[in-house]
């Protein structure tokens, strides 16, 4: 019998490998992305102090609506970049969370770059 590969388990292993190499500091925090089947979340994290500095998702009250999941991801990217600039954060380290840099993750990253975040 063929065993089915658990994609989320593989993603978590990949994410653990990446997280061992990158971490966010006060001067350059980590932009973390989490993607579920319906929603997308982004957090800017200072790993040294263990604090979330800014966050956004498509479940936020000031999000509005989006036509597609990729469109929602780009709006979340704009929102997290706006909230980061309000707190004086301009430069971050991008943590794609073990996901491929494609689709929703790419849309979020590009929208955040266009709205002033550098990575």
Curated annotation (Swiss-Prot):
GO terms for biological process: translation. One of its GO terms (molecular function) is structural constituent of ribosome. Keywords: Ribonucleoprotein, Ribosomal protein, RNA-binding, rRNA-binding. This is one of the proteins that bind and probably mediate the attachment of the 5S RNA into the large ribosomal subunit, where it forms part of the central protuberance. HAMAP family: Ribosomal_uL18_B (MF_01337_B). This is Large ribosomal subunit protein uL18. One of its GO terms (cellular component) is cytosolic large ribosomal subunit. Part of the 50S ribosomal subunit; part of the 5S rRNA/L5/L18/L25 subcomplex. Contacts the 5S and 23S rRNAs. It comes from Listeria monocytogenes serovar 1/2a (strain ATCC BAA-679 / EGD-e). SUPFAM superfamilies: Translational machinery components. The keyword Ribosomal protein applies. Residues 1-25 are annotated as: Disordered. Residues 9-20 have a biased composition (Basic residues). PANTHER family: 39S RIBOSOMAL PROTEIN L18, MITOCHONDRIAL (PTHR12899), LARGE RIBOSOMAL SUBUNIT PROTEIN UL18M (PTHR12899:SF3). Belongs to the universal ribosomal protein uL18 family. Coiled coil: none annotated. The keyword Repeat does not apply.
């Amino acid at each position: 019998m063929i065993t089915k590969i658990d994609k989320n388990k593989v993603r978590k292993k990949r994410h653990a490998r990446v997280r061992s190499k990158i971490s966010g500091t006060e001067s350059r925090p980590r932009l973390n992305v989490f993607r579920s089947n319906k929603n997308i979340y982004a957090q800017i994290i200072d790993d040294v102090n263990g604090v979330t500095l800014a966050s956004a998702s498509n479940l936020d009250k000031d999000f509005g609506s989006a036509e597609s999941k990729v469109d929602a991801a780009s709006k979340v990217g704009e929102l997290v970049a706006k909230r980061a600039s309000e707190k004086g954060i301009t430069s971050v380290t991008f943590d794609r969370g073990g996901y491929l840099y494609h689709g929703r993750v790419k849309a979020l990253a590009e929208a955040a770059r266009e709205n002033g975040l550098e990575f």
